[in-house]
Amino acid sequence: MPGLSCRFYQHKFPEVEDVVMVNVRSIAEMGAYVSLLEYNNIEGMILLSELSRRRIRSINKLIRIGRNECVVVIRVDKEKGYIDLSKRRVSPEEAIKCEDKFTKSKTVYSILRHVAEVLEYTKDEQLESLFQRTAWVFDDKYKRPGYGAYDAFKHAVSDPSILDSLDLNEDEREVLINNINRRLTPQAVKIRADIEVACYGYEGIDAVKEALRAGLNCSTETMPIKINLIAPPRYVMTTTTLERTEGLSVLNQAMAVIKEKIEEKRGVFNVQMEPKVVTDTDETELARQLERLERENAEVDGDDDAEEMEAKAED
């Protein structure tokens, strides 16, 4: 089956001052030739004078073939198909927004393209028709090209009735819902922080236990907190949640409570690693670390037992 393709948005060309995502195809004397990724790879050009605000010493340091770049549209000739672009006029804030919009629009595109493949479409016109009857309906409804469809599809995970108004047959609707659920159902993330908690005063380990218990009490039903000992005085705090921001907030809150409690007892609190979302690789490394410590502790216990047995034998 041939690879189907279609632009991301209803309008065939970007407007002047739109910030768009491009892929650099080649570099010539006049400038860089690029493909506009959101507009079915139509060609555009970044003139050399629009690459940087500074004097250009090396083009390759500014732009490279094969790399994606956020650029702003400065001229569009729809009849001739000329699109002039600028890299130097894009602010860091605009680049961040462009990347976010591109990521969400690409997700919608991937969903609809997979729907087309499952339904065995063979023509680009069929894919474009699917866009017209789904993504572009929501983009137009919410007046936010790229975001409208993404937000509607995300909402459809919990409320598929949002798709009822679309002009889809039963097969199209079923395949679309299945693909939306597969791609957009929220994934739980694990959040971790490493802390040091110690008390060298009279209450010692009891003060540490009390402070850690106070931190555990910050758990909620949807965000349970776990605290594991790595090696005194270092502990790892973790929580698993669908809400990344709230998860970070809950761990920060628990750390503040632990700090307050241990310092009341004249103990010490240090943050070794601020709360962050951890990957499977991080988790595997932590599990390996804990396993190694457990093994080392078991070996120490074994040595103690051996010494006791030797002492008894001598008696």
From Swiss-Prot:
Phosphoserine: residues carrying this PTM: S49, S52, S158
Region (Disordered): 292-315
Main location: cytoplasm
Disulfide cross-links: none
InterPro entries with a match to the protein in the record: NA-bd_OB-fold (IPR012340), S1_domain (IPR003029), S1_IF2_alpha (IPR044126), TIF2_asu_C (IPR024055), TIF2_asu_middle_sf (IPR024054), TIF_2_asu (IPR011488)
Transmembrane annotation, as ranges: none
Compositional bias annotation for Acidic residues: 299-308
Subcellular location(s) of the protein: Cytoplasm, Stress granule; Cytoplasm, Cytosol; Mitochondrion
The entry's keywords: Acetylation, Cytoplasm, Initiation factor, Mitochondrion, Phosphoprotein, Protein biosynthesis, RNA-binding, Translation regulation
Matching SMART domains: S1
One Gene Ontology cellular component: mitochondrion
Pfam families to which the protein is assigned, alphabetical: EIF_2_alpha, S1
Activity regulation description: Activity is regulated by phosphorylation at Ser-49 and Ser-52, which stabilizes the eIF2/GDP/eIF2B complex and prevents the eIF2B-mediated exchange of GDP for GTP, thereby preventing the formation of the 43S pre-initiation complex (43S PIC). This results in the global attenuation of 5' cap-dependent protein synthesis and concomitant translation of ISR-specific mRNAs that contain a short upstream open reading frame (uORF) in their 5' UTR, such as ATF4, ATF5, DDIT3/CHOP and PPP1R15A/GADD34.
Chain positions with N6-acetyllysine modification: K141
GO biological process: cellular response to amino acid starvation; cellular response to heat; cellular response to oxidative stress; cellular response to UV; HRI-mediated signaling; mitophagy; negative regulation of translational initiation in response to stress; PERK-mediated unfolded protein response
Modification sites for Phosphothreonine: T279, T281
Role of this protein: Member of the eIF2 complex that functions in the early steps of protein synthesis by forming a ternary complex with GTP and initiator tRNA. This complex binds to a 40S ribosomal subunit, followed by mRNA binding to form a 43S pre-initiation complex. Junction of the 60S ribosomal subunit to form the 80S initiation complex is preceded by hydrolysis of the GTP bound to eIF2 and release of an eIF2-GDP binary complex. In order for eIF2 to recycle and catalyze another round of initiation, the GDP bound to eIF2 must exchange with GTP by way of a reaction catalyzed by eIF2B.
Protein family according to the UniProt entry: Belongs to the eIF-2-alpha family.
Subunit: Eukaryotic translation initiation factor 2 eIF2 is a heterotrimeric complex composed of an alpha (EIF2S1), a beta (EIF2S2) and a gamma (EIF2S3) chain. eIF2 is member of the 43S pre-initiation complex (43S PIC). eIF2 forms a complex with at least CELF1/CUGBP1, CALR, CALR3, EIF2S1, EIF2S2, HSP90B1 and HSPA5. Interaction with METAP2 protects EIF2S1 from inhibitory phosphorylation. Interacts with ABCF1. Associates with ribosomes. Interacts with DDX3X in an RNA-independent manner.
Protein name: Eukaryotic translation initiation factor 2 subunit 1
Organism: Rattus norvegicus (Rat)
